[in-house]
Amino acid sequence: MKAWKNTQANAVIAPPKAWDKAVPFGWNSWGALQFNLTYPKALEVSDFYKENLQSHHFVNSDNLVYTGLDSGWNSFSEEELKAFVDRCKANGQIAGVYWTPFTDWAKNPEREIKEIPGYKYKDVYLYANGKPQELDGAYAVDPTHPAIEAMMKRTSELFHRAGFEYVKMDFMTHGAMEADKWYNPEIQTGIQGYNYGMQLLDKYFGDMYINLSISPVFPAHYAQSRRIACDAWNKMKDTEYTLNALSYGWWQDKVYQFNDPDHIVLRDATDGENRARVTSGVITGIFIAGDDFSKGGSKEVKEKAMKYLTNAEINAIANGESFHPVDGNGEKSENQFVRMDKDGKAYYAVFNYMDQELKMTTALERLGLDSSKEYRLKELWSGIESTAKTNLEVTVPACDVVIFKVEE
């Protein structure tokens, strides 16, 4: 009963995938560059982090940054991939890469599978009522087919030769889709097929940090982290979307090592939206930025990065442990989140999704604090200090956030 109450019953049976390092801070190319990703731009972003962010508090407690290539990396030669990894290492970074193991984006049934001569893609699709299963513009493939394992082996060998240590595995739900049948006759459900495929993924990629995206929640023990809100960008609606997922999914950092709030994008947003989006990241889990920091990227977004990604006290919050909502019975997205740390400090964040100022009063006991004691507060974006006893009076500007460090 105690494990269930602490949201850890599943973790007792299937513990999270091991990870003895700090929560990842970093960059992912899909936030802005997307298919405009090139080898020179990737090097420039790595250099920008080294020269401008890593020495200004944008590093995890291991003093590392994870610099990730998303979709589009396959335009690089193998030599360029290796050189990118080497540049990252020289810059005090871990290189990351991307793959979608359970999809066929070409949707060309007659295409030959080069990993296993004699097979075509039509041989590995998952079929429902005789038709290929399609989702998000891609056909789903059978995780139990030997050709899919051959692809995993080949891709893993490339990633390891290049030296990648982090991989984002995307569109994983395709591997869990239901089908008329699977290559392995013992598989009878989509999740059984997905679990089979994840065992293979662990076999070939298990020594890398694995981050899942667009994936089933369970089974959870094959990856260190899972994205809880996909395609969250820069606006307040993206922050609200992320925090809606955190409201109901905060507990997933008990079955994964960390939650993933998606890339933090700063471009074309107000100062308040920037503060809110960064805060939504640090209170959720891994802390990955996504703007174009190459030489061709805008001066404005680089200035924003220097302003909003380098707040030492904000960044120190990001230890990988998710905040949880203060309330859970609202009709709209929750906007108050709290975390109690082992050293006795509490953190309390209030988001304002609206276009007008928000004023509210919060009872300290609702935050798990002793209402008979007086607490010292510091709002970490403004640096303003105050005290509170019994209740906390909060004012949040339109489309903005405040986050307090609370100590006795």
Located regions from the model:
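Carbohydrate-recognition beta-sandwich/jelly-roll modules
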Residues: M1-H57, N91
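The substrate-binding groove and active-site-proximal loops of carbohydrate-active enzymes
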Residues: F25-P40, G68-E78, E134-A150, M177-I191
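Active-site groove signature of glycoside hydrolases
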Residues: V59-S71, M152-K181
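Acidic/aromatic-lined carbohydrate-recognition and catalytic surfaces
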Residues: D62-L126, L201-D207, L212
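Glycan-recognition surfaces
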Residues: E112-P146, A150, Q192-K299
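Carbohydrate-binding surface patches
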Residues: G281-T284, A289, G328-L369
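Solvent-exposed beta-hairpin/edge-strand motifs
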Residues: R366-G383
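C-terminal beta-strand-rich structural cap/linker in extracellular carbohydrate-active enzymes
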Residues: T387-E408
